[in-house]
UniProtKB/Swiss-Prot annotation:
One of its GO terms (biological process) is mitochondrion organization. Keywords: Carboxypeptidase, Cytoplasm, Hydrolase, Metal-binding, Metalloprotease, Mitochondrion, Nucleus, Protease, Zinc. It comes from Xenopus laevis. Metallocarboxypeptidase that mediates protein deglutamylation of tubulin and non-tubulin target proteins. Catalyzes the removal of polyglutamate side chains present on the gamma-carboxyl group of glutamate residues within the C-terminal tail of alpha- and beta-tubulin. Specifically cleaves tubulin long-side-chains, while it is not able to remove the branching point glutamate. Also catalyzes the removal of polyglutamate residues from the carboxy-terminus of alpha-tubulin as well as non-tubulin proteins. This is Cytosolic carboxypeptidase 1. Binds 1 zinc ion per subunit. Residues 842-1132 form the Peptidase M14 domain.
Length: 1225
């Protein structure tokens, strides 16, 4: 106890002592005329001793409210005694050395930097200057400088720059003095004006004298000199001076010296400093040339290879990589033009816009690369992978609409009512009287018990439908338990139980000639799997040599085969018995897929492959072929890709986000750099080229063969770089010169056990989910024949990075110096001579949609479901744009039931305006399947709404393999404000449907446009809100007090509760200026739909909820489409609980289903489990969005339209009872 008391007394004594000393100094400062030099020297020495030995003294001097710093600085400013000055400088050094940040800021705020610079100026006037004073003073300035934003300006204005530089010049042999001087200069060089000033006064030459030649002495001085030099060389004037004096070669030689001698890696910072100097010099064109001429590429490449084994040397390898990539000569993309390889003549040429600009260029203009892409304005940081992703976009806050008058929705038809009457025929449900229909009333009797509501997803069980194929898949693929096997979903539709042999195809394509004859080129069959081709036959042709059966081995001569489009041909085991096409047997290079000869197992597989009706109820290969025949493409495709013909079954296994190994991107970049260093190792052979159809495939065994001449295919050119490495170039959208993202192509002729590297080298976006766990998709024909007919994620060593191919300013909006990006992935194929397909995402073609719609129409129950499919309009390419109407048939043809039928609110859905966003079609498929389902939930939904659906807004873009545009070369989702009936017919007429509904006072309750998002994870929505838009701007508070219904958030919040992939935290309801012409904003603003949304589905995967860390698949996308429907049913409860007269028991059962999430047990059967808790989504690495931005928005109170916040957690039945009780009272 006595010890504690003594310590306390000692602390009090110290505090009293420092206060006393400061009081003495303050008194001396007040009596400046009677300045006592000896006393001041004594007091400052005592303070220095206490500050040096006692932390509490330092705290007391800098504590809040203390005047210690002011007293010390005042004394420094007033005294002329050298020892007193040194004492005070030492005191300030002690204060700045410990807990430096806060105390240094305190010194700066009290004017410390200004006083010290004045002291430096006065001290420099003495001759000779005091060395100790200069060392201490510069040391203190070097500590204050980095914390003072205006230090560089203060130093230049006060004249301190010249003083410090002259000290260095005059004392090159005095490392102790010039070290703090260089530290001050290093800080001053952060100011570009200071850098230029110092360069003019010989600073660059002085620093090169210090850093060379190689020596191990004074390494600290060398390090600071290199840092200062690197800062100086950021000035282009200084960089040019360094190049003119051949300092680039000096730096490279010095770096090699340190690399050879620093074997223990103790001086890595010096080596990095040299690289930073090279990095600064190579910002200019002559610097890059000097670096290449000095053999810098090879030097840094070799040293980097030697450093890669040591993890601690990664900073050296990374900086070397940046320098080499910057100096790598900009290459021309090996294309004759960046315009699409396919041309389509528009009905008329627009007078303005990108298409007009594209075709106004003289033919002699080279649009692939600019005349001088290697300009001198290159910034060092532009080559870094952390490049600002929004540098070429307008600022987010500037993009937000601030004019409230433009935000207020108003129903602006824009067309006369007479003009809109043309759309009356698309709404037969509003005039149908059902007198000629044989309707059976399903009205429940009072007290009757209804059956349970089946799981609210896209399907319903029908155990009697055979499912042998799914069981076999389970046993073969992932050993699914018998319990899980029994839960697999049969079709939910009223399907025929007659199974036909539609899976006997061992081939990948059917070939159909215009004249109706079919030829078998046995060499193609044996080597490649005979291609599926399309014939438009007329009449029967005699079969000269007969058809090749599945068991016959074809010879090497073409065999014409009898064709008929209406009747079957007499070819046993033919897959196309009802159509004018034929397939040969699978036999790759004379070798069976896995065995030397056909085995009983192969025959068993073939038998099992025929039972596809049970798992793909909407897929019919024969029907697909018939539809493709009538699909019009610009390239006039005559082939069908195997996956589209045969169909896709979601795999049983989960596909996790890929974890990228450390250093894989760096390794790929170095391999690219090797192309310049070792050019003789590069094959550079074109093996596929749409621009040169005569470029035939090479016959060498070791060369892969490529093809994309089928619906939705996109691959323009392939160049073999090394034996197992290929550069791939994507085709631009038709009538455009960019939009390279979607790919879909075929590869064949591979070997097993070989790692093939594929580089797609003309990507445009500055980042991609391929860097964050996403993998491309592959479909293997041999895997499909082994009962695994699915797309699955493949690829290792995947990364996305900037490459050395220049982008023309004609494709970048006038910006020069842009580069393309590379997607690279490595694949080892499991089967020799397989035929595989690669895609950016799960393909979903226009013909697939037409097939699904026809199957839905033929399989639905007409007594329960009102289904109409009509052609809204014809596209530019001559393809029909379907529009679908789905609702429940009226209970009877009595007036009351028909009246209720006609007055159901509308739900308007659209999808696939961007062709590359194929996931939108899979979500739409889930929605359509659910709406056509036979469950009680689906029936309730149909009885609640009339669904008007345009499932594919851009058929031409989908057919022709575009990523974003239609044949007009424009983004259709930017044409909604003023669509042109000739150039944008699908948008014009879809908007016309909405305008018609608005004109007859039947504005839809919900509008939703399905999209895909390539840069973010999860599924989320963008909506429209005036209040939230204004809240994100700097508008005054008065404008934020506006009253706005919060019903726009109801549906997203419901989906957040029931859909595992949905993330409310990613949703945004801000209206941006750049999105004012999109469907979401136009329908909200002009049609007056408050709940107008864009629903974005990730192309990658999820980072929250049940699917966290998993890549998304078609079953999750279809589930999302079904969940959207369930959310609409919940929306009905929340907004109009009295309108839907379901018994409370039925509402309670459905509420239990809605408040849980789905667990997928088979490709199409969903089983319920407890919902996952919400996860707060981390800030996404990219704010870019093709359709909308994604700011973080706090959830506002009162989002639901019900009267109190507590109702968010109510069940549907509770809400209903609450409203009923409220009305009864």
């Amino acid at each position: 106890m006595s010890k504690v008391k003594a310590t306390a007394e000692k602390c009090q004594l110290n505090i009293s002592r420092i206060q006393s000393l400061l009081s003495q100094l303050e008194k001396v400062n007040a009596e400046s005329l009677l300045f006592d030099t000896d006393n001041t020297r004594y007091v400052t020495a005592k303070i220095f001793h206490l500050a040096q030995t006692q932390e509490k003294t330092r705290k007391e001097m800098t504590a809040k409210g203390s005047t210690g710093i002011e007293v010390i600085l005042c004394t420094l400013e007033n005294t002329r005694d050298l020892q007193t000055i040194l004492n005070i400088l030492n005191i300030l050094n002690e204060l700045a050395s410990t807990a430096g940040g806060r105390r240094i800021n305190a010194l700066i705020s009290k004017g410390g930097a200004r006083i010290l610079l004045q002291l430096l100026l006065s001290a420099s006037k003495e001759s000779p200057s005091n060395e100790e004073l200069m060392i201490v003073l510069h040391s203190l300035l070097a500590k204050l400088g980095p914390k003072d934003k205006k230090f560089g300006v203060k130093a230049r204005v006060s004249g301190a720059l010249n003083i410090s530089l002259n000290l260095v010049k005059q004392n090159l042999q005095n490392p102790r003095l010039i070290l703090p001087c260089l530290q001050v200069l290093r800080v001053c060089c952060m100011n570009s004006v200071n850098s230029a000033y110092l360069g003019k006064n010989g600073a660059v030459e002085i620093l090169f004298k210090i850093i060379g030649p190689f020596t191990r002495r004074n390494t600290g001085l060398i390090k600071v000199s290199l840092d200062t030099l690197a800062a100086l060389l950021k000035s282009r004037t200084n960089a040019r001076k360094a190049v003119d004096r051949a300092y680039v070669q000096t730096l490279i030689s010095t770096y090699m010296d340190w690399h050879r001698h620093d074997t223990r890696h103790r001086h890595m910072l010096i080596r990095k400093g040299i690289l930073q100097c090279l990095k600064s010099i190579t910002n200019i064109k002559i610097g890059r040339k000097a670096f290449i001429d000095a053999n810098g590429m090879k030097t840094l490449y070799n040293t980097s290879q030697e450093c890669q084994a040591v993890r601690t040397l990664d900073p050296l390898v990374n900086t070397s990589s940046l320098i080499m990539r910057k100096c790598f000569p900009k290459n021309r993309l090996p294309l004759p033009t960046i315009k699409s390889a396919f041309q389509f003549q528009l009905p008329f040429m627009p007078t303005s816009g990108p298409v007009a600009l594209l075709y106004s260029m003289p033919p002699e203009v080279d649009d692939v690369v600019d005349e001088s892409d290697d300009n001198e304005d290159t910034d060092a940081e532009t080559e870094a992978e952390a490049e600002n992703e929004d540098s070429d976009q307008i600022c987010k806050n500037d993009d937000i609409e601030t004019d409230i008058t433009k935000l207020i929705p108003g129903q602006e038809l824009g067309r006369t009512l007479e003009d809109l009457k043309m759309y009356e025929r698309f709404f037969p449900e509003l005039t149908e009287d059902f007198q000629e229909f044989d309707l059976v009333s399903n009205e429940p009797k009072p007290g009757a018990k209804l059956g349970p509501i089946i799981v609210p997803t896209a399907g319903e069980e029908q155990p009697e439908v055979p499912n042998n194929f799914m069981k076999n898949l389970a046993r073969r693929s992932c050993n699914i338990s018998l319990e899980d096997e029994s839960n697999q979903r049969p079709t939910f539709l009223d399907m025929s139980k007659n199974v036909t042999n539609k899976g006997n195809s061992l081939d990948q394509k059917v070939h159909v000639d215009k004249d109706g004859s079919c030829y078998y080129y046995s060499n193609d069959i044996v080597r490649d799997l005979e291609k599926l081709s399309l014939h438009k036959a007329s009449g029967n042709h005699p079969c000269r040599n007969g058809c090749v059966s599945a068991k016959d081995k074809p010879n090497f001569l073409p065999h014409p085969c009898n064709k008929s489009t209406s009747s079957s041909i007499s070819c046993s085991n033919s897959l196309f018995e009802k159509h004018s096409m034929h397939l040969g047997p699978l036999c790759c290079s004379g070798i069976a897929p896995d065995d030397d000869e056909s085995s009983p197992l192969d025959e068993q597989v073939m038998r099992e492959m025929t039972d596809f009706d049970s798992i793909l109820p909407l897929h019919d290969p024969d029907l697909y072929i018939e539809i493709v025949k009538n699909t019009k493409s610009v390239p006039e495709y005559t082939e069908v890709a195997y996956p589209d013909y045969f169909g896709h079954v979601p795999p049983f296994f989960k596909e996790r986000l890929l974890e990228r190994p450390y250093g894989v991107q760096r390794s790929k970049i170095f391999q690219d750099i090797e192309r310049m260093i070792h050019p003789n190792d590069i094959i550079d052979r074109v093996i596929y080229d749409l621009d040169n159809p005569s470029c035939s495939a090479h016959d060498e065994i070791d060369i892969l063969k490529f093809n994309s001449k089928f619906e939705s295919g996109n691959l323009r050119k392939v160049i073999q770089i090394r034996k197992n490495e290929y550069d791939l170039i994507l085709n631009s959208d038709i009538n455009s010169n960019h939009y390279h993202q979607w790919f879909y192509f075929e590869v064949s002729g591979m070997r097993t056990g070989v790692a093939y590297r594929f580089n797609i080298i003309n990507c445009e976006k500055s980042n991609s989910q391929f860097n964050y766990g996403m993998q491309p998709l592959m479909y293997s024909v041999q895997e499909a024949l082994a009962s695994r007919p699915w797309w699955y994620r493949v690829g290792t060593d995947i990364c996305y990075y900037k490459n050395h191919f220049s982008r023309s300013s004609l494709a970048t909006g006038g910006q020069k110096g842009k580069s393309y990006y590379t997607i690279t992935f490595t694949v080892t194929f499991p089967h020799k001579d397989d035929v595989c397909y690669f895609a950016y995402h799960y393909p979903y073609t226009y013909s697939t949609l037409k097939m699904h719609l026809q199957k839905l129409e033929s399989l639905h129950s007409p007594q329960q479901i009102y289904f109409r499919q009509e052609v809204l309009c014809e596209t530019l390419g001559g393809n029909g744009c379907p529009v679908i109407t789905i609702t429940a048939m009226p209970e009877s043809n009595y007036y009351e039931h028909v009246y209720q039928f006609r007055n159901r609110p509308y739900i308007f859905l659209t999808s696939r305006v961007h062709p590359g966003e194929t996931n939108a079609s899979w979500v739409m498929k889930g929605t359509l399947e659910f709406l056509m389902g036979s469950s009680a939930t689906a029936q309730s939904l149909r009885e609640s709404y009339i669904f008007k659906i345009v499932p594919m807004l851009n058929p031409d873009g989908v057919i022709n393999g575009n990523h974003r545009c239609s044949l007009s070369g424009e983004d259709l989702n930017r044409q909604w404000q003023n669509p042109n009936s000739d150039l944008h017919p699908t948008i014009y007429h879809t908007k016309g449907l909405l305008q018609y509904l608005s004109a007859i006072k039947r504005v839809p309750l919900v509008y939703c446009d399905y999209h895909g998002h390539s840069r973010k994870k999860n599924v989320f929505m963008y909506g429209c809100s005036i209040k939230e838009t204004v809240w994100h701007t700097n508008a005054n508070a008065a404008s934020c007090d506006m009253v706005e219904e919060s019903g726009y958030k109801t549906l997203p919040k419901v989906l957040n509760q029931i859909a595992p992939a949905f993330s409310m935290s990613s949703c945004s309801f801000v209206v941006e200026k750049s999105k004012e012409s999109t469907a979401r904003v136009v329908v909200w603003k002009e049609i007056g739909v408050q709940r107008s949304y864009t629903m974005e589905s990730t192309l990658c995967g999820c980072d929250q909820g049940k699917y966290k860390d998993l890549q998304i698949g078609t079953k999750e996308l279809e589930e999302m489409g079904a969940k959207f429907c369930v959310g609409l049913l919940r929306l009905k409860r929340l907004t109009s609980p009295m309108e839907l007269t379901l018994p409370p028991s039925l509402i309670d059962i459905e509420n239990e289903l809605i408040e849980s999430s789905c667990k997928v047990a088979s490709p199409t059967t969903y089983v319920l489990e407890d919902d996952e808790p919400r996860f707060i989504e981390e800030v996404d690495y990219s704010a870019e969005s093709n359709d909308d931005v994604d700011p973080d928005l706090p959830e506002n109170i009162g989002d639901f339209e019900t009267s109190t916040l507590e109702e968010e957690s109510f069940s549907d039945s509770e809400i209903t009872r609450t409203h009923m009780s409220g009305q009864s009272t």
